């Protein structure tokens, strides 16, 4: 268990019990006790097996402290939603109405433009870092330029309705993803990375380290976007790009798109200097536990320029979703987060 600088209390173990004690969170684990002031905790993340008292649950809800329950691979399972959840009914009403006008199309376009821009930035970053290998550096640079051209075309493309927009935007996103991951594979050869695989786990004899790390961090990213979607009273199940399915948080998957390349760079940095042997079946759980911890301590505190200010990722995500809501309510188009190269 640990508490990050921003206030994430990460419970990543077994046999842990959490209770409320006079404005503090009492943590009992393996005969040891630890108390943390509740006011210093902004989110409790339960990844291991833990028991929480009903009094603590009530206190978390009343104080507005977020509670996330996730699997070992970071996939969000549940969140605590207080009766006094944030946002207004109008936010959700405007979200529903936006599927019938240009607002839905522009949000769908904006999040994928933001994603492609950040993918191009990553390729430019790795091209610069590999200048000693002129051929590889040139290939990465050319691919980045190709993504930028695709991005500009998407910016200017016209769509008659949201259904046509969804189909054509996702087709372009898929094309750009193929270009991007082919070049990423060329710089991750030592890890035997061949491309994206969305389904990986911690079981079995053959573990794909890169895809496993990406999927864990994408899952944790989705949980953070989900948190902010709920804060503003939006419907997480109604998206603009991802097809609706029962239980699928489609809007969350839409809005996390610009952040995915940021997660990519974080994961590749995490793997730098590590050995693939750390992902052998008998010790991989410990390696992934370290990654989960680093996601909250490092990635969520990563500072980037956003709308003229240098802000932490936690704050950027909040302001980004607030921008989406403002646009739905008649404001200017939202600013997409950007990672410089």
Curated annotation (Swiss-Prot):
Molecular function (GO) terms for this protein are: DNA binding; endonuclease activity; metal ion binding
InterPro entries in the record: Cas1, CRISPR-assoc_Cas1, CRISPR-assoc_Cas1_C, CRISPR-assoc_Cas1_N
| Top-level EC class as recorded in UniProt | hydrolase
One GO BP annotation is: defense response to virus
Question: In terms of domain of life, where is this protein from?
Answer: Archaea
Which prosthetic group or cofactor does it need? Mg(2+); Mn(2+)
The EC number(s) this enzyme carries: 3.1.-.-
Where on this chain does Mn(2+) bind?
173, 242, 257
**One Pfam match, by short name?**
Cas_Cas1
Q: Keywords on this record?
A: Antiviral defense, DNA-binding, Endonuclease, Hydrolase, Magnesium, Manganese, Metal-binding, Nuclease
* Presence of the UniProt keyword Iron-sulfur in the record: no
The subunit field of the Swiss-Prot or TrEMBL record says: Homodimer, forms a heterotetramer with a Cas2 homodimer.
For this protein, the record's PANTHER family field holds: CRISPR-ASSOCIATED ENDONUCLEASE CAS1 1 (PTHR34353:SF2)
* Family, as annotated: Belongs to the CRISPR-associated endonuclease Cas1 family.
Q: What does this protein do?
A: CRISPR (clustered regularly interspaced short palindromic repeat), is an adaptive immune system that provides protection against mobile genetic elements (viruses, transposable elements and conjugative plasmids). CRISPR clusters contain spacers, sequences complementary to antecedent mobile elements, and target invading nucleic acids. CRISPR clusters are transcribed and processed into CRISPR RNA (crRNA). Acts as a dsDNA endonuclease. Involved in the integration of spacer DNA into the CRISPR cassette.
From the Swiss-Prot or TrEMBL record, give the protein name.
CRISPR-associated endonuclease Cas1
